[in-house]
Amino acid sequence: MHLTQKAPLKAALLTLALAASHGAHAATFQDEAIAFATNNPMSLTVKGDDVTVNLTTNVSLLPGVHVEQKDEAPCPIGLTTTNENGNDTLTIKRVDSTQPCKAVVVVNLPEKSTVGFTQRTPSIDAKGNFGKITTHAEHMSLTFEGRADSLELRAAGVATARIRVQQLPISLISVSARHVATNISLPAGATADYKIDPASSTFDKAVPSGNPSDTTIRLTGSTVVGAARNQ
């Protein structure tokens, strides 16, 4: 998702790297959650056999939701919007899921709005190879390296990964607009790989009280690269 720094409306770009399905795999991990906040533009890329994506926001989606074709071959995408309990849900569904393709769905959001979606990730193995996070001063990117049969808002009976993106006032983050704070919660056995630069960036790991099976990693810095394990 790309959230422009100075525009009053935030344009969130969801890049779908859509591949053909190769069959489901059993899930043997707990729910994972990632929440991050930054005043810098953000880029979110999801790779895998994504067929359906549901985005839900705490405010009404602004007009202008559309699909941008990024490959020479067309990537037909259907968009529908529903409202439940004051939350808008945008369903992004591939029209043809038999061929790999890529498209960008552009969503306009008001300032300080939140966006969330739930991802079915049945192929993430018991070792918990969760993904990779990289950041620098201008944008943040989050990549899931495993395949996903679909992305769903509600996926009853399956293990899910939940992502929440929240745009915050710059005063709550840093006066320099270059500070990024990331909180990552991983299940037992999961790993998270990322980079840390400059050396002045800080990295803290702690086990939340009352739940020793989960490890929370807090990453602070303009750009960070490193590795963390739940141990």
Please provide the spans of the model-predicted regions.
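Extended Gly/Ser/Thr-rich low-complexity repeat segments
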Residues: 100-112
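Sec/Tat signal peptide C-region and signal peptidase I cleavage site
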Residues: 22-26
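Short, surface-exposed interaction patches in beta-rich subdomains
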Residues: 146, 150-231
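Bacterial N-terminal signal peptides that target proteins for export
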Residues: 2-12
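Right-handed parallel beta-helix
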Residues: 116-159
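Bacterial N-terminal signal peptides
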Residues: 11-21
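Short linear S-[DN]-x-LW-Φ motif typified by the pepsin-like aspartic protease active-site region
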Residues: 27-85, 106-108, 126, 186, ...
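Extracellular beta-rich ligand/substrate-recognition surface
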Residues: 27-29, 94-101
